[in-house]
Amino acid sequence: MKQESRTNINRVKKDISSPDSFTPPEELKRQLITTMQSIYDEEDIEAVERAYKVAYKAHEKQKRKSGEPYIIHPICVAIILAELELDKETIMAGLLHDVVEDTETTHEDIVRDFGEEVAQLVDGVTKLGQLSYSKDKIEVQAENLRKMFLAMAKDIRVILIKLADRLHNMRTMQFMRPEKQKEKSRETMDIYAPIAHRLGISKIKVELDDLALRYLKPDVYEDLERSLDSAKEEREAFIQEIVDEVKGHIDHAGIKAEIDGRVKHMFSIYKKMVNQHKTIDQIYDLFAVRIKVDTVKDCYAALGIIHEMYKPIPGRFKDYIAMPKPNMYQSLHTTLIGPEGHPFEIQIRTFEMHRVAEYGIAAHWKYKENNNTKGLNKEEEKLSWLREVLEWQRDMDDNKEFLSLLKTNLDLFAEQVYCFTPNGDVKNLANGSTPIDFAYSIHSAVGNKMVGARVNGRQVPFDYHLQNGDRVEIITSQNSKGPSRDWLGIVKSAQARSKINQWFKRQFKEENIVRGKELLEKYCKSKSIRLPELMKPEYIKKVELKYLSLIHISEPTRLLSI
């Protein structure tokens, strides 16, 4: 058997191309056609060109916020869909996805020119519309998600177009206001990236996460980028040593394989730093070596070779081939001790598993040159989680209950914690939130009178970190003297911190009012005047104040010198 092994070292780059925002439309169109030429037949390319001409004419007078021609956006969306190797109807719908909503073109026009299938895809994207997501509005969030899952059920390609649309919008966010950048990035990280993950499309998911991190935590992103660049040679030398050793042993065993090493994505590194409470310099498993082989048998054979070469870390082996993830992902994962005691991860999978890992559900809509049959066929059972969601939607009228179940079972919102009040209301809090955060999310009066908390019927300390599904009961007392300043070092949310600070400011203000009133009464007695007489112009002019309450609070001593 001929031994064949290819190796690559690369920093994480955009796998799906990111054309320059100001590239002329005609040049982008050529890029789209070039992308299609290797796998699509001439008839399909001609159909896409017809869709381009209609989209170009419809958007001819429109501009984006950047000032560039609007048509650039749908072309870039179509390029992303073509790189996912989706069918021509999806690519055509990508080009046309904004024409019904933003131009005079009608649904009937699309049906007449391109057929019912393309028109339905465009209609699906139009109806899905702009998500109005806010982390404090559970009802709105749940309704948006219901809408998205129903669209998925009708035709999964609608969501694929929407993901491509969001990806290009995230790539060109530099022209938006900072507050809009953060809003869109939070929406992306909380909704779009998790859905891309649930559909198994890692090529889109990882880029969405990285782009969202860039705008949500720009300082963190820049620090990570600098750190990775500064130690690039050292890290690449480390991973190259691993790749070369693995290549030699795999070749010797006669296994045909493609081997590459890569630095993990920014968001993945950031999560690792947060979860492990480490700096980037303290983390060495920033790398993953990937081995791609022809058969499942070769996967396990390669695993045996690797475990003979390096000492595996107990508890860090995962067999996702025997037990695939719900999003169709399959691979063998093992973490090992490498040179100088530094840990690193190896992933082993077949070439087909790799295609599914990169493209997810899109891999099963892949254009087939000799087969125009579309659909998921035998792969439909791998979307059982979507059918389960649809069953929940039918059975649940309560949006809060639906969202809670969705979070618990599908892990769509990993960065937030969803807890219940004793009455069953859902509270969404930042990961790491405490019972104090929970109390202030209900009302400031509840937080200010809080003296304890029970979680799932058990008394917990104030610094307990709430978990998904916790039922939280806040214990209050009218005899409470108010919050402690120590709470400011415990709470997670800015809302709770602000309300605690407001309480202390108010207390200081009330104490000043009492003290000021005492001084004013003493002053009035010494001058043989009544308190209301202080509002006469001669007194107000002397102290340069207009309101008696302000005299009470801030200027009581100034009157003593009159």
Residue ranges and their predicted role:
Residues M1-I16, S21-F22, E104-T106, E116, ...:
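Terpene synthase/cyclase
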Residues I9-D41:
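Short, contiguous pre-domain boundary segments
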Residues P24-L28, H107, G115-V118, G124-V289, ...:
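Internal insertion modules embedded within essential enzymes
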Residues I39, A58, D136-E139:
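N- or domain-start disorder-to-order transition segments that initiate the globular core
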Residues R50, E60-G94, E101-D109:
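Alpha-helical phosphate/pyrophosphate-handling elements in metalloenzyme active cores
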Residues I72, D87-L96, E117, L121, ...:
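Alpha-helical scaffolds flanking conserved acidic
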Residues K292-D294:
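Short hydrophobic/aromatic beta-strand micro-patches
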